[in-house]
């Protein structure tokens, strides 16, 4: 491909990009298309906030689940691994929550103004549309009194326009052009809306007429005017004298205007900081620009956290330097990078599959159950950590872990997904099913229990020497 061909392709791409930019805004040409545009842009901002808050909620669930998982891990290093992930999640969540809180206000303000604008245009569309005009009954006496020095007047006290309820649907071509995808900042940098007059002004086209010399005694109102004296009153002014008004239309034509959404070279939005009263289009342009400047960032999903991320993420390595080190030694994230990576590999590795299975799938692939007095509580790690019994679950498993010097408690049940298969079986069926057993008068899944710690076995996980029970009890009494 020669230089001329490259230039031609670049030129065509530029032209095509320019042709698609602002196409949604440029499609606004009438009230219905503007209402559709306003609502699409409002939806865009609201969906951005919803996506960010939903992801933040999900990440906070992961944080709570990893906090609980640390008490369920039998291996001491794996327990610290879950705790480190919980600390990392907390760091990420606090940071992203601050961004979501600060930016969401600007986005929702813009969305609210856009929805209010759509409602205003919709109301104007009803009033400005075609309808039936009624002049009401005029009064020549009141008319004479209402205008100084008038010889006669025909007063109309209740001219009205009645309009049917109208459905405002933009043509299909405009609806296809004004889409959520076209509300992205790189596709929209100008605003085109109906002018303010359409929503604030009712235009009336009328003509006044007279015949003969109208006077206060001309009080025939049958034809929407004031007629009398000689002849026969009619819609064609059959009487000798007449005075009246003819209203042709009541309504303001919709025309459009444009303004920019781009900030200035000093990164100030249009009319940012001004206290002057702004037209609707300028007020919306400022709000939209400020919403974009707020830079709402959707949090990265912790459910997609990868083993490879742990060895490169600065925040996590700083946490790992404290949490994963042995014997209380604090490592330097820069100087001890290799040692930290080895600890990460030992704790979470050796590969992506192992990490995901041990720390992500483990939150949902097993059911755990425990009893508080006579009440049985069960669920996955995720369900327990984020449910109504989260506090009880944490207290129970944390206390069991502490009571066994860091090992998972001997009576901590690990219940498989066969829990549901066993429920409701009769006593005979339960005893013949390999995965089930009778417990507490009910058929339940067989429970895998951790080994009871031996009195001579070291439970700290750090050394290989035996600890005698008497020595351990003495240490407890001393402290």
From Swiss-Prot:
The keyword Transport does not apply. Its main location: membrane. Keywords: Cell membrane, Glycoprotein, GPI-anchor, Lipoprotein, Membrane, Signal, Trypanosomiasis. Glycans are attached at residues 120, 458. It is a lipid-anchor; GPI-anchor. A lipid is attached at residue 462 (GPI-anchor amidated asparagine). Residues 1-12 form the signal peptide. It is found in: Cell membrane. Residues 463-479 form a propeptide. The keyword Glycoprotein applies. It comes from the Eukaryota. GO terms for cellular component: plasma membrane; side of membrane. VSG forms a coat on the surface of the parasite. The trypanosome evades the immune response of the host by expressing a series of antigenically distinct VSGs from an estimated 1000 VSG genes. This is Variant surface glycoprotein ILTAT 1.22.
């Amino acid at each position: 491909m020669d230089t001329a061909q490259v230039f031609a392709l670049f030129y065509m791409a530029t032209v095509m990009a320019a042709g698609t930019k602002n196409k949604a805004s440029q499609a606004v040409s009438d009230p219905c298309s503007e209402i559709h545009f306003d609502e699409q842009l409002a939806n865009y901002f609201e969906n951005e906030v919803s996506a960010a808050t939903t992801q933040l909620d999900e990440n906070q669930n992961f944080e709570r689940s990893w906090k609980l998982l640390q008490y369920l891990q039998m291996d001491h290093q794996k327990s610290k691994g879950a705790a480190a992930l919980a600390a990392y999640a907390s760091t990420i969540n606090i940071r992203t929550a601050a961004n979501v809180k600060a930016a969401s206000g600007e986005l929702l303000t813009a969305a609210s103004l856009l929805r209010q604008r759509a409602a205003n245009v919709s109301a104007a569309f009803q009033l400005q549309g075609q309808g039936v005009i009624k002049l009401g009954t005029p009064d020549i006496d009141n008319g004479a009194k209402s205008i100084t020095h008038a010889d006669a007047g025909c007063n109309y006290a209740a001219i009205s326009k009645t309009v049917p309820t109208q459905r405002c649907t933009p043509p299909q071509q405009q609806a296809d052009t004004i889409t959520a995808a076209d509300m992205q900042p790189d596709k929209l940098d100008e605003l085109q809306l109906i002018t303010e007059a359409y929503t604030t002004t009712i235009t009336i086209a009328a003509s006044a007429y007279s015949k003969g010399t109208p006077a206060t005694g001309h009080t025939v109102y049958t034809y929407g005017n004031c007629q009398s004296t000689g002849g026969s009153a009619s819609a064609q002014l059959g009487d000798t004298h007449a005075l009246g008004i003819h209203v042709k239309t009541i309504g303001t034509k919709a025309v459009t205007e444009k303004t920019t959404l781009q900030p200035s070279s000093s990164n100030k939005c249009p009319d940012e900081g001004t206290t002057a009263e702004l037209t609707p289009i300028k007020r919306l342009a400022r709000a939209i620009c400020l919403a974009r400047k707020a830079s709402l960032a959707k949090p990265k999903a912790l459910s997609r956290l990868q083993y490879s991320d742990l060895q490169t993420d600065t925040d996590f390595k700083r946490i790992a330097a404290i949490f994963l080190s042995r014997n209380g030694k604090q490592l330097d994230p820069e100087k001890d990078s290799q040692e930290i990576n080895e600890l990460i590999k030992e704790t979470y590795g050796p590969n992506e599959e192992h990490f995901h299975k041990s720390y992500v799938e483990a939150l949902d692939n097993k059911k755990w159950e425990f009893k508080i007095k006579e009440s049985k509580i069960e669920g996955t790690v995720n369900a327990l950590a984020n449910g109504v019994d989260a506090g009880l679950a944490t207290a129970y498993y944390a206390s069991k872990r502490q009571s066994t010097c860091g090992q998972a408690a001997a009576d901590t049940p690990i219940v498989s997904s066969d829990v549901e298969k066993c429920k409701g079986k009769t006593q005979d069926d339960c005893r013949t099913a390999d995965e089930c057993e009778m417990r507490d008068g009910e058929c339940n899944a067989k429970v895998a229990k951790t080994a009871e710690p031996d009195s001579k076995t070291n439970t700290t996980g750090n050394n290989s020497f035996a600890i005698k029970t008497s020595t351990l009890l003495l240490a407890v009494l001393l402290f």
